[in-house]
C-alpha cells in the first residue's frame, strides 16, 4: 500500500481482513520497481498483488462507450482496477499499462460524496440512474478483502433515490454474506454467463454456471433483482446450441419476474489483446475465428454471424419470458433491426428502455 493510503477507511478495512497476507508500505505505486519481465508475464505477476492507492480522478463517471454504436447510458462508480480472475478474452489485459490489482483507498472519504451528490440530485429531479461498479473490475471478486459491495448496499438502502446499483460478477455469492445484507430490489446482482465449455476453459478462477445460477436464485429469493450478460458470446460451430441451453437453465432456476435485463454482446477485442492473451494463455482458442475490424477499431465476428446468434438467443429468451428486457451491447441500429426486429429509437432510445425495465422490476 502507498504511504498516502494509510489513513483511509478502506485501507483499515482491508488490513483487518488480510490475515496472514504479507503487507508492504511503499512510497508510490507509480514508482514501484515492478519485475523486469515481458508484459504478459508481468500481468500474471500482478494477478497476485493488491495495491491500495489514493485515487486522484473522478470516481463517478459515464461508461466509456463509443459514438459508433448504441450505448446504454450506464454510469460507473469507480472503486478500483484489475481482476484476480483470469478470463482469456478480458479486455483489461490490453487496457492498462501497469500491473496489479488496485483499490482506491480514499473511496469512502472522497469517492462516496461524489456518488451521494448524484443520487440526491436524481432524487430531486426524479431521474433514474443505472450505476455499476463492474467496468474495470469484477464487482465481487475481492469482496472478502474489501467489503466494498456490502458497504455500498448498506448506504444505498438509506438513500431513497430512483437508482439501481448493478454488481457484475463471475463469482458465487456466499450464503452467509447474502443473508446479512438488507434486501432491496434496487440492488441488481448481475452475472456474466457463457457456454459451459467456455466457462470451463476460458474463465479461469470463476464460478461454474451452476454456481452462478444458484447464486442468482438465492439473490432473487432474498429480495434483490438479478440480471445476466451473455458477453462475450464466443462462436464456435458447437457453441450456439450450448448458449441456448444456458438460456433454458436460467429460466428453470431463476424467476423471470426478478430479472431486470439480459444483454447480448459478441466477442470483440482490441488487436493488441490477441497477442497478449495467447502468450499468457497458450491453450486458448477463442481468437482462431474469422474477424473483421469494426467501426470502433476492435476485431469482431462478421455481421451475419453476430445477428444470427443474437436472433436465436433473443427468440429463446422470449419463449421463456416475453417481458424481460433484452438488449445488445455495442452494436449498430442495423444489427438491432436484423437481430431483434426493432431499433431502440422506436422505443425512446436504449437508455429509456433500460430505465423502464428498472422501474418495472426494481420498484423505482
Walk through the language-model features, giving the residues of each.
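Hydrophobic faces of well-ordered beta-strands that scaffold small-molecule active sites
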Residues: 129-133, 165-167, 189-191, 226-230, ...
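Catalytic cores of alpha/beta
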Residues: 238-253
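Conserved radical SAM core fold
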Residues: 136-141, 172-175, 187-206, 232-236, ...
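N-terminal [4Fe-4S]-dependent radical SAM core
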Residues: 29-80, 94-103, 363-364
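Short cysteine clusters
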Residues: 83, 87-90
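Auxiliary Fe-S-binding modules of radical SAM enzymes
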Residues: 1-11, 251-364
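Conserved Radical SAM active-site core
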Residues: 51-69, 91-190
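N-terminal alpha-helical interaction blocks
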Residues: 1-45
Amino acid at each position: 500500500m502507498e504511504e498516502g493510503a494509510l489513513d483511509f477507511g478502506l485501507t483499515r478495512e482491508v488490513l483487518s481482513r488480510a490475515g496472514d497476507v504479507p503487507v508492504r508500505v511503499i512510497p508510490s505505486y507509480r514508482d514501484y520497481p515492478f519485475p523486469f519481465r515481458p508484459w504478459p508475464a508481468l500481468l500474471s505477476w500482478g494477478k497476485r498483488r493488491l495495491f491500495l492507492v489514493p485515487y486522484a480522478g473522478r470516481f463517478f463517471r459515464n461508461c466509456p462507450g463509443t459514438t459508433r454504436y448504441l450505448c446504454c447510458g450506464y454510469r460507473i462508480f469507480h472503486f478500483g482496477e484489475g481482476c484476480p480472475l483470469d478470463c482469456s478474452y478480458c479486455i483489461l489485459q490490453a487496457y492498462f499499462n501497469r500491473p496489479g490489482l488496485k483499490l482506491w483507498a480514499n473511496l469512502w472519504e472522497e469517492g462516496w460524496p461524489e456518488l451521494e451528490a448524484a443520487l440526491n440530485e436524481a432524487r430531486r429531479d426524479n431521474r433514474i440512474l443505472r450505476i455499476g461498479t463492474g467496468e474495470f473490475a469484477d464487482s465481487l471478486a475481492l469482496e472478502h478483502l474489501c467489503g466494498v459491495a456490502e458497504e455500498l448496499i448498506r448506504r444505498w438502502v438509506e438513500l431513497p433515490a430512483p437508482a439501481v446499483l448493478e454488481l457484475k460478477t463471475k463469482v458465487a455469492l456466499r450464503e452467509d454474506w447474502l443473508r446479512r445484507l438488507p434486501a432491496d430490489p434496487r440492488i441488481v446482482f448481475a452475472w456474466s454467463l457463457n457456454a459451459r465449455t467456455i466457462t470451463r476453459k476460458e474463465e479461469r478462477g470463476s464460478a461454474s454456471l451452476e454456481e452462478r445460477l444458484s447464486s442468482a436464485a438465492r439473490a432473487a429469493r432474498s429480495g434483490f433483482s438479478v440480471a445476466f450478460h451473455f458477453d462475450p458470446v464466443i462462436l464456435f460451430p458447437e457453441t450456439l446450441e450450448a448458449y441456448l441451453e444456458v438460456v433454458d437453465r436460467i429460466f428453470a432456476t431463476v424467476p423471470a419476474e426478478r430479472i431486470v435485463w439480459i444483454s447480448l454482446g459478441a466477442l470483440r477485442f482490441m488487436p493488441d489483446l490477441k497477442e497478449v492473451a495467447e502468450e499468457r494463455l497458450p491453450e486458448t482458442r477463442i481468437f482462431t475465428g474469422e474477424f473483421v475490424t469494426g467501426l470502433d477499431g476492435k476485431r469482431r465476428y462478421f455481421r451475419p454471424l453476430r445477428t444470427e446468434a443474437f436472433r436465436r438467443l433473443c427468440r429463446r429468451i422470449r419463449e421463456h419470458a416475453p417481458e424481460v428486457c433484452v438488449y445488445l451491447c455495442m452494436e449498430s441500429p442495423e444489427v438491432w433491426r436484423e437481430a431483434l426486429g426493432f431499433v431502440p429509437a422506436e422505443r425512446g432510445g436504449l437508455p429509456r428502455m433500460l430505465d423502464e425495465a428498472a422501474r418495472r422490476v426494481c420498484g423505482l
